[in-house]
Every structure is written in structure tokens, then in C-alpha cells.
């Protein structure tokens, strides 16, 4: 969660709406786990980012409510910020 909070802070400093969210996952009435991710959005561009146990970031990119990709894995925070900002520039430029 620490890496996702850092990411959200950086993105907000760049003028991108970003926050870390937690959604519980249940099987019946039993809590299985918490789905913790960073949601970020600017215009019609949206990213959902998870920080995996393998120390990788998993990105899902949606444009105008259409999923574009959901299996991009990046190793570092700077790669994630670069991917998000360059994608926003391409689609919202």
C-alpha cells in the first residue's frame, strides 16, 4: 500500500486525480482479502494500478469507459508515472 500511496501523491502533484482505494472481497460472508489499488483519472483516461507481491505494478488502462489493456506490468514507480503521463498526453493532448 505504501508504494500506491507514493504513486497517488506524485500523480496528484502532476494534476491527475488519484487516490488509493480498498474494496473487500468476500466469498459468501467470509472476507477473503482486500483489493487495494490506486485509481487515477484525467479526462477520459483512467488507470487502476495494483502493487503485486512480486514487487511489480500492474496497470489497467481504460479510455472512455472502454478497457484498452489490463496486463501491463512495470517494475518501478518512475516507469508507472511515465506510462500514465505519456498516455494522458496522447489521449487527452
PLM features: what roles do these ranges have?
Residues 24-25, 35-37, 45, 55, ...:
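Short non-domain terminal segments
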Residues 77-88:
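A short, charged, amphipathic alpha-helix used as a generic interaction element across diverse proteins
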Residues 1-2, 89-93:
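Short intrinsically disordered terminal tails
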Residues 42-79:
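Intrinsically disordered, low-complexity regulatory segments enriched in Ser/Thr/Pro
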Residues 1-42, 66-71:
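Negatively charged, low-complexity tracts enriched in Asp/Glu with abundant Ser/Thr
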